[in-house]
Amino acid sequence: LANRTCEGDFEVSPINVEGKDVVILGGGDTGADCLGTSLRQGARSITQLEIMPRPSNERPGGQPWPTYPMIYRVSSAHEEGGERVYAVTTEEFLKDDNGDLRALVISEVEFKDGKFEPVEGTRREIPAQFAFLAMGFVGPEHGSMISQFGVELDPRGNVARNGTYATNVDGVFVAGDAGRGQSLIVWAIAEGRSAASAVDAYLMGSTQLPAPIAPTARPLMV
């Protein structure tokens, strides 16, 4: 849709939140992008929801330098406006008499027995005519292509691969989010180059193509 709008297929984007109440489900970078765009379109109010608790302002003791710390950050979009609400979950979408979205029902949550549970007595409505889902990536779609190839999946639902990006099916390789899981485009680019090297070696018996990273490589974290 964004590409078609930029190419001039629409005089005005079909999605316009001017004068509307916007709720964004997800507290990450994608949610911040949604917030910034909504601000520029002139939304009446913008609320960004995050199920996790608000991070600390200080680096946690268990995340020493040079690991990337999980701390409270304010992006350029957040500096411009909007409200961030932490430790909440969306329980219900409410519609008006015309069937259009009018509000979300949210509750505070607490972590119990390995999962987030709503806190009794904390349900409330927040107005919303637009809701954007920015909740992250739960794995590749297990639809026709994956089922037709017959590739195996790992415990997280991603396509399983070995150290050369090869799946259990001869001649089928996987790179990027489909094999790694949710990540950044720089990882997908590096994996794509490495997978191309592996495919070249598979077809030609050897390769001179660079392979920047192994499929098991991970960011420096604890």
Explain the meaning of each model-derived region.
Residues 1-19, 112-182:
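FAD-site-proximal beta/loop scaffold in flavoenzymes
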Residues 9, 35-92, 207-222:
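Rossmann-like dinucleotide-binding cores of NAD(P)H-dependent redox enzymes
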Residues 17-28:
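Beta1/beta-strand and adjacent pyrophosphate-binding region of the FAD-binding site
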Residues 31-36, 41, 175-209:
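A conserved FAD-binding loop/helix module that cradles the flavin
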Residues 27, 50-54, 95, 177:
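Cofactor-binding loop segments of dinucleotide-utilizing enzymes, especially the Rossmann-like FAD-
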Residues 10-13, 76-83, 87-129:
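A structured beta-alpha segment of the ubiquitous adenosine-cofactor-binding alpha/beta core
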